[in-house]
Amino acid sequence: MLHLLVTGSRTWDDAAYIWKILTQLYLNHGAIELHHGACPEGGADQHADDWGNAFAIQGAKVSVVPHPMDRNRLGKGAGPVRNTAMVKVIEGLLYKGKPVACHAFHRNNSRGTNDCAYKALVAGIPLVTHVWNGDAAIQTVHEEQLALFEAA
């Protein structure tokens, strides 16, 4: 089972692209535990959540683990605190020898996506970024972690 962290811009509106990436990961691994930030404004988190729930309903080995931020208690600092918590969950699985990865769907220079992706990279979690360039997404596997990603 792949333990996957999805982070992304709330303005990422290409659901089909995210569904394509997640479906390919599912086909490669046979099961996914999908963690995401549960952004209430939609975007990449919502597309990932929709994909996970749609596949789970059809009997696929997919579980969805949303990590909503506590904006009422933490105010503007809620996003980075939530990102740290999500990364720590995945990092813990990495240290237990579980296959893990982070896919970051980045658009409009999203600070939250940058924050979460950077924290994942520092934690040693294999990171793939998908950057929306206006017409299409460009996928980048971070070279220093390519061997880790291929092993996941």
What are the roles of these predicted feature ranges?
Residues L2-H3, T11-E150:
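Acidic/glycine-enriched connector segments
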